[in-house]
A protein has these predicted regions:
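Short alpha-helix in the alpha/beta-hydrolase fold that links the catalytic acid
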Residues: 242, 256-266
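Short beta-strand/loop motif that positions the catalytic acidic residue
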Residues: 240, 246-248, 252
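C-terminal catalytic histidine-bearing segment of alpha/beta-hydrolase fold enzymes
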Residues: 269-315
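Alpha/beta-hydrolase active-site loop
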Residues: 132-153
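The serine-hydrolase catalytic nucleophile loop
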Residues: 94-108, 121
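Conserved alpha/beta-hydrolase
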Residues: 108-128
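Hydrolase active-site cap/lid region
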Residues: 174-226
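An N-terminal hydrophobic leader/cap segment in hydrolases
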Residues: 11-66, 76
Length: 315
């Protein structure tokens, strides 16, 4: 009897050991895949970079501010000659460097009476950081950027709105959990959660196999980013009364609409606080038409911000 119990105990220990080894292997694989996809620096291609001198009447002032681990982020306040009516904080996408890719949009907003605070997130262009670290870092950096604009004393006390694309589209919605005072948000080609975006990318590479490591991804992000990782765009919407405009093109292969637009529309499609605009054939940069930047759409953006700011001014 004792020999039988001893054999069962040894077998149980072996099985436990195997389970631990499998978990450790999955954990190591998860971290490696995660870092390969997200934990790297991104620099703008100098051949395509725009400069403030390329735009008539555009001015900017450089600032540095600290993010969560003390890393210094570089941001610029862009204005035209007229006094701004409000401040738009812009969050850029991931993979192409910092905010420089959005200079045309920045200039449009500035020329139409808004100050634009645009910065390079951790691990991008002029900001510090060996790598981005992960998608929740975008929410963290935006949280610190909005607080810097509000609290540093460097900027006029004006209503604040947000604009984000892709990674930035996720960030500007999720950050509402921390900044419900924001008046209006425009999110282009964004996604609801970091985990969802990892799933979308992982399915392209590993198919259904991605679902075996998603629990480890969730744990890894929670350990690394805390509550920032668990808060979604939908959480931000529920914590804020901000007006929200959501844009997406249904042929977007980088961020499929099912991971953002569709989720939002199911809950808020009939909510007057939300406005949904979809396209069929604009790909990931849905603010561009076949000729380039869609200025009619940007005029719509400006009108959206103006309406929300004036509503708050009027009480």
């Amino acid at each position: 009897m004792n020999k039988t119990k001893s054999k069962k105990k040894k077998l149980l220990m072996i099985l436990c050991g195997l389970v631990i080894l499998v978990i450790a292997a999955d954990w190591s694989l998860t971290v490696a895949i995660y870092n390969e996809n997200f934990n790297q620096r991104f620099e703008s291609n100098e051949s395509f970079m725009r400069h403030v001198e390329d735009f008539d009447g555009l001015q900017r002032t450089r600032y540095e501010f600290a993010s969560d681990k003390g890393q210094k982020l570089t941001g610029y306040m862009y204005t035209s000659k007229e006094e701004p009516r409000g401040i738009i904080v812009m969050a850029h996408g991931v993979g192409g460097g910092g905010h420089n890719s959005y200079m045309d949009i920045i200039n449009y907003f500035a020329q139409h009476g808004y100050g634009v605070f645009a910065y390079d997130a951790t691990g991008n262009d002029e900001s510090e950081g060996e790598g981005v670290g992960g998608l929740p870092q975008g929410v963290i950096d935006l949280d610190y950027a909005v607080s810097f604009v509000e609290e540093s004393g460097n900027f006029p006390n004006l209503p604040i709105a947000l604009f984000g694309h892709s990674w930035g589209g996720y960030s500007v919605c999720s950050v509402l959990t921390y900044h419900p005072e924001v008046k209006a948000v425009i999110a282009c080609s964004g996604f609801n959660s970091s985990l969802g975006m990892f799933e979308a990318e992982g399915k392209k590479q590993a198919g259904a196999g991605i679902y075996f490591i998603l629990p480890f991804v969730k744990l890894h992000e929670w350990i690394k980013f805390g509550g920032y990782a668990s808060h979604t765009a939908m959480d931000g919407f529920s914590e804020s009364n901000a007006a929200v405009m959501i844009l997406h093109s249904f042929d977007d292969e980088m961020v499929p609409a099912e991971y953002g637009y569709d989720i939002y529309y199911e809950t808020y499609g009939d909510d007057s606080r939300f406005r949904f605009i979809h396209f069929e054939d604009r790909g990931h940069n849905c603010f561009n038409d076949e000729t380039g930047l869609d200025t009619e759409l940007l005029e719509d953006f400006v009108g959206f911000y103006e309406q929300k700011f004036s509503q708050n001014t009027d009480g």
